[in-house]
């Protein structure tokens, strides 16, 4: 028997007289009855009208932004710029939630400029941002080489950082008692006050670079949200856990009031905090809803070099879900990129 005859006989599992190469019983579909339609009748998501334009030589930043594609991140960036400019015109809060990296990559001068221009009306910090800002105010530098000192037990043990931050917080907590009022100061206001003393216990040589110091002078609220055990000042003998807890709770209540006022066009930006500030912001929204109404018609923005779960859910999705209908719906936008590039670009794109 020929080899070919043997192969063909094995390839007829259904007993059909038609010779097939495949051993499978299922047969491929036929395309002769597929229905098509004219290309021009289709709804398409991309058009040449949305394409990038070549910016003219010597174009300013606004012209360059206008030249970006009106697609995906290009359109998202434009939408964030528009929301910030609209909030400033309407005198609505623009709150920046700041993680530690935002401060330690050198963006304080831009944040201070945004404050003076009306694009930062309040700031919320995690404990790392507080520490970096404080160290910059004192000596003009920050950020330890952790692997180099961790094994020696030296990580986080700088005397001035631990002692004077804790003492500032304790003094702020006790200020209420001296004033005949049980309410002391929050962490942000207490540290801002410390940095602006006429006769501080140590030299504050780089005060103009401190967001906390500048905000205090300008009466711009800064709140600090501590999670016990996450920051180096919690290792220092000068810590008063009761004062720290009370002060950071005051800051939470202050931020809740600021978040409530976002209603009707305010903007909240979470920049570089993956866990603490997104969780705090969500609780502020819930508290506002419980005491009256969740803020509606707001814009939330998450800026980071990776889009994490909690910022996505707790900043962009959940807080905007309660106000995403009507004439002025809430919106959430993700801008992905390095802080040291994205924040300067956003600051430059905003109208003066």
Mark where each language-model region is.
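Ligand-binding beta-strand-loop-alpha-helix segment within the catalytic cores
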Residues: 144-219, 223-224
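N-terminal amphipathic/basic leader segments beginning at the initiator methionine
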Residues: 2, 7-10, 17-56
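Short acidic, glycine/serine/threonine-rich loops at helix termini
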Residues: 106-110, 134-142, 234-238, 280-283, ...
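A generic, well-ordered mixed alpha/beta core segment in the N-terminal half of proteins
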Residues: 106-172
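Glycine-rich phosphate/diphosphate-binding loops that line cofactor/substrate pockets in enzymes
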Residues: 79-94, 214-218, 257-264
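Conserved mixed alpha/beta catalytic, RNA-binding, or beta-rich assembly cores of soluble enzyme
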Residues: 224-261, 265-267, 279
């Amino acid at each position: 028997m020929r080899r070919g005859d043997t192969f063909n006989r094995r390839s007829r599992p259904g007993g059909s007289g038609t010779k097939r190469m495949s051993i499978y019983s299922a047969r491929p579909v036929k395309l002769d009855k597929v229905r098509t339609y004219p290309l021009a009748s289709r709804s398409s998501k991309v058009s040449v009208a949305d394409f990038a334009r070549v910016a003219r030589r010597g174009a300013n930043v606004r012209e360059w932004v206008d030249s970006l594609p009106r697609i995906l991140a290009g359109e998202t960036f434009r939408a964030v710029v528009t929301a910030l400019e609209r909030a400033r015109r309407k005198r609505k809060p623009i709150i920046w939630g700041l993680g530690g990296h935002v401060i330690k990559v050198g963006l304080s001068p831009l944040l201070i400029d945004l404050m003076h221009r009306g694009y930062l009306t309040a700031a919320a910090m995690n404990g790392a941002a507080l520490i970096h800002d404080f160290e910059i105010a004192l000596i003009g530098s920050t950020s330890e080489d952790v692997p180099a000192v961790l094994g020696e037990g030296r990580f986080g043990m700088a005397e001035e950082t631990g002692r004077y931050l804790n003492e500032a917080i304790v003094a702020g907590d006790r200020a209420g008692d001296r004033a005949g009022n049980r309410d002391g100061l929050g962490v942000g206001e207490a540290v801002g006050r410390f940095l602006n003393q006429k006769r501080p216990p140590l030299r504050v040589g780089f005060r103009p670079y401190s967001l906390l110091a500048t905000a205090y002078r300008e009466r711009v609220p800064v709140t600090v949200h501590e999670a016990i055990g996450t920051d180096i000042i919690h290792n220092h003998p000068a810590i008063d856990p009761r004062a720290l807890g009370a002060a950071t709770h005051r800051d939470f209540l202050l931020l809740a009031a600021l978040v409530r006022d976002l209603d009707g066009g305010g903007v909240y930006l979470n920049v570089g905090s993956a866990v603490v500030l997104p969780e705090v912001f969500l609780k502020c929204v819930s508290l506002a809803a419980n005491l009256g109404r969740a803020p509606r018609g707001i814009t939330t923005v998450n800026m980071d070099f990776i889009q994490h779960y909690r910022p996505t859910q707790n900043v962009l999705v959940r807080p905007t879900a309660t106000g995403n209908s009507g004439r002025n719906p809430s919106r959430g936008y993700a801008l992905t990129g390095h802080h040291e590039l994205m924040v300067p670009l956003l600051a430059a794109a905003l109208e003066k």
